[in-house]
Amino acid sequence: RENTRAVVMLHASNVCGTLLPAAEVGAFCRENGLLFLLDTAQTAGAFPIDMEAIGADALAFTGHKGLMGPQGTGGFLLRPELAAELEPLLSGGTGSASHSEEGPSFLPDRFEAGTLNLPGIMGLHAALTWLEEAGIDAIRAHEQALTDRFLRGAASIPNLRLVGLAGAENRAAVVPVVPENTDPAFVADALGREFGIQVRVGLHCAPNAHRTLGTFPTGAIRFSFGPYNTPGQVDRALEALDALCRRTVWL
């Protein structure tokens, strides 16, 4: 539309894990004078991300997923010109520029009103130090191998539908599945109670994505793999899924 000001996009879907063409969208935005805001909640810490190469004007991230930090942490990066244009959502005391009724005008204080979550920030710093030592490329290769292992194994489980791309190459380490013999919530509950396997079931705060994928209203069971998971754990999850998808009686 003619009045479009910005494009806001996920880097990868939190429902099906599909990686979106961020660099191509960034190039389109530059050609058409649009701002490009990229949400990297599912990719930060799990993929190499070059904000400048992608062409993003702003990049948001959460600390508790791929960055391995505590819950309640996160942040954003802004191109300097955009930072000067934006008005803070919240304003107030920061411990600096206390003489001003409007709060500080300089970065990062301008966007960090109030008392910061210092324990969370220190935890995130420790996690980032570990990530730097482990290497993002190595983490990506490990998670991709686990995802591929799961996809291959799940494809042969009866009464189970895989949602999303068939391969692991163009997706984050997120795989949703739908049992065809019962409600996904029953299987997810049994995975936790009987096998000690934690998954996320339902609509994942994205009902429209589930409508598009044909998994609304019951949703799907989402498996996610991280740097600490092992091939043996993937195999155990597959064995549990296989047993549950063959079950004929649910109480």
Question: What is the predicted role of each segment?
Answer:
Residues R193-E194, Q198, A209-L251:
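PLP-dependent enzyme catalytic core of the Aspartate aminotransferase-like
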Residues R1-G45:
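Active-site phosphate-binding strand-loop segment of PLP-dependent enzymes
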Residues S105-L118:
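A short glycine-threonine-serine/GTX helix/turn-capping micro-motif
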